[in-house]
C-alpha cells in the first residue's frame, strides 16, 4: 500500500497551493531550527550553571551522569528511531574508553583526539555488532547484543584497562597506575563538567542533524518495514549499519569522557547487567526526545548518588530502583521525557487559552 | 540461715556478679580517659569502605567509629570531639572517587582512618597525595594500597599473607611443590601470589599460580586443574565468599586426603569453619594478619570492650574490626600529642609520618609510618588451624615474611632506627 | 584427550545448571512471550529460605518445599499483578519489566541475609560416582547427577504439557497471539497463572541446585541467568531438547577450555561464544517485511 502511494500517486500543484505551502514550510523549518537551538542552548546552560550549585561530590557525580547521557543518546537512536534493541551499549562504552585510555597513555595525544579515537573504535565495533540485526527479530537481537556484552565482560576482566604501561594492553606492572590526562582547557573537576556538557550538546546536535536529513527519513522507512524501505529506494544495509555506527560512536565518546572523569576504568564495573540497566533506564527516560538521554544519565548516576548521600543502604536503594523502573515502565510509555514534554505542552495550551479568553 | 537474709544475700551476690563481669569486660579505655564528654570544635575524620557489593568490608569503619565515640565520651582530642564520616564506595571505582571527593574536598577531613576497600586505593591514592591527606587504613587489599605515599594499611596485605602461608607449609609439611589459586582481579591476581613465588625460588620450593575468574560458576574444574599439577600444598588466596565453594569442590573431589591446604588471611573469619564443614578439621591452616581474635592481651581486650560499650551488637568482631580499632587508636594518640588549636591537614600528616613506635598486642611488631614512598609496616603474622567450628592456634607465634619485594621497606625501617 | 576427560565430567555439573535454567526460561517464553530476567533472583531467594530453615533444623523435604513455594508465590505475584499491566507493550519492554522485579527481589535478599559465606549442603552431596581416569581422579556427586536427570525430566514434562494437555495448547495459543486468543475465549488470566506458576517452580528447583553446585550468593545466582540465556538461544527459544543439549555442551566446553593454553582465562565467555556462533549459523528468524 505504501509502495503504491510513493511510486504511483500523481499530485497536481498549481500556483495558489505553492504560495500557501512555501511560507508554511518556512514556518516549520524555523520552528525546527528553534527547537534545535533550544536543545543545544539548554544543555550548554546546564553545563555552565551546575558547577555553581554543586559541591565536589555532586560535580563528580553529574560529570559521570552527563558522560553516560552521551551513551544513552545512542541507545535512544537505535530504539526510538529504528525500534532495535541494543543490550550492549555499556560494553561499547567500555571499548571506547579502552581505546581512549590506550591512546592517551601510549601516544600522549590531546584529549579531544583521544575522545574521537574512542568514538571511532566503538563506531566500528558497533557496526559489526549491528550486522546480525539485518536478519533478526526484536527480542532475538536483544539477546545477541546481551551475549556480546557478556563476552566483553569476560574479555575486559582478563585484559583490564590501560593504566600507563607498555605493550598492546598497556597495563603497568610494578609501579603506580596512571590516571588519564585531562584536556588542557579543563583540568579541574568543575571545568571538566562544563567540557562534558559541551560534548553532550555536540553529540545531541549530531543525532538531531541525522534525524532531520535523509538518514532520519530512511530510518523511519526502515522502521515501517523492509518492503517500504526498499520500494522507496533506501539502502537498508547502509542506513541500518550507520545507525549502529552512530550509537557506537555515542558510546565510545561517553566512555572516553567517563575515563577522563574518573581517571581510570575498572573491568569489574563492566558487567553485562550494566548494559541491560542502561537500556532499561534509557527507555524510562524516553527514547524519542533528547531530554530522555539526559534523564537516563541522571537516573544511572545521580539518583543512586543521592540515595548514597542520604546514607540509604545500597541494597534498599536497589529495591527502590527496581520498583521505580517497574513503575516507570507501566505508567510512562513514552518515558519521563515524554511525560515532561506532554505536561509542558498542556501548560502552554492552558496559558494560551487563558490569554485568548481574557477580555 | 535466716530466711529474711536471703534477699539481702541475693542482692550481694548480684552485685558481686556485676562487679566480676565488669572486671571481665574491663572498662573501655580510649583517648584521655576522663569520662567527660568533649564539647569543642569537631575534628573531621573520614573513611571509605566497600559495603554494598561482593562482600561487606565495613567492620573496620564500625570499629573505628566505636573507638571515636569512646574518645568523645572521654574528653575528646584535648577537648575537641571527633566527627567521623564513613562513606560506602559500593565496590565501584567511580563511586569511590566521588565519595572521596566529598570527604576530602567538601567535608575537609584532616585525616582518614579505618578505610577498607578493594577499589578505592587505585581510584584515590593520587588524589590523597595531591591533597596532602594521610589515610591510616584498616585493611588494604590490592597492590596500590601498599605502594602509595599517603596510604598506610594496618594489615600486612595479601602478598605477605600468602608468603607466610607458603613458609608455614614448607616448614610443617616439608612441601616442595605448591599451587597458589587467586582471583584475576587487577593488581591482585598478578601480585598476590608473587611473594610466595619469589620466596620459594630462593628456598627451593616451586610455586605455580592459577588465576581464576571470580564470576565463574565452575569451581570443580579449577580444583581439578590445580590437582593436575600434582602439588603437595595448595595455597587458597581469595575472599571468603569465593573460598567456601572452592573448598566444597575440593571436598567433593576428595582432595583433602592427598594435598595439604593452607590459606591467606581472608579465611580467618568466624563463619568459615562452619561453612566449609568438618571435612577440613585440623586440615586447613590459615595465616592471620594480626594476633588471634581471642588473644588475652590488654589491647585486644580493650578492642572488645570498646565495641561492646560503644559499638552496635551487629558489628562483626573480626580482623577488619581489629584493624579499624588499631587505626583509630593510632590516629587518636597522634592527635593527642598535638596542640588542639593547630590541628589541620598538613600538621596532622606531618605528625603521622613521624610515628615510629606504635605498640599494640594486636600487632606482632611495633607499627610505624615514616616518610617512605610506600607503607607496609605490618609484615608478620601467626598461623591458625581450623578446629571444629573455630580455629586453634598453631605453635610458632608470629612469623615474619621473607619476601624479596620488602627490601625497600626494610631500608625504611633501618632509616627510622628500627630493627 | 585423556587429560580432558576429568574436565568433561566436571563440566556435566555446570552443564546441568545451564540446561535447567535454559528450560525454565524457554518455558515462560513459549507461554507468555516474556524473557524472565528474574528467574535467577527467584531461585536465589528460594535457596536462601531453604538455608535459613535448614539452619533452624527443619527437615530437608520441608525446607526444599518452602524454597520452591517462595519462588512460586513471588512468580505468581509478578505474573498476576504486574505483568498484565505491561501486557500491551512490546515483548522487549515486558522482559525489561522482569528486570525491575529481579532488582527488587535481589535487593531484598541481599539486605535481609547479608554477605556472610554460606553453603547449601544437600544430602546427595556426600555420595558420588567415582572415576579413576588417566588424567586424574574425578568424582561426580549425586547432586550433579540429579541435576542432569532433573534437566531431562523437566524437559520431558514440559514438552508433554505443551503438546498433550489443554492448558499447554492454550499456553501456546497465548504466546502466538494474545489478543486473538482472548477473542477466541481462552481465559487469559487462568493460563497466565499456570505459566508463571510453572516458571516459579522451575526457578525454585534450579535455585536450590544452583546454590549447591555453584555458590550460595544472591547477586551471582541472579546474573547467572545471562549465560543461561545462551543455552536458551542454542535451543532457538523454541526447542527444549536443543536447550538441554546446548546447556550441557556449553558447560562441558567451558570446563574443558581450562586446558586450552591461550583460551583458559577467557573460558567464562564460552556460553556467549557458543550462542553467538549458533545465531550466526542459524538461517531462520527472518525479519518481517
Functional labels for PLM-detected ranges:
Chain B
Residues 31, 96, 154-178, 190, ...:
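Hydrophobic alpha-helical segments within soluble ligand-binding/sensing domains
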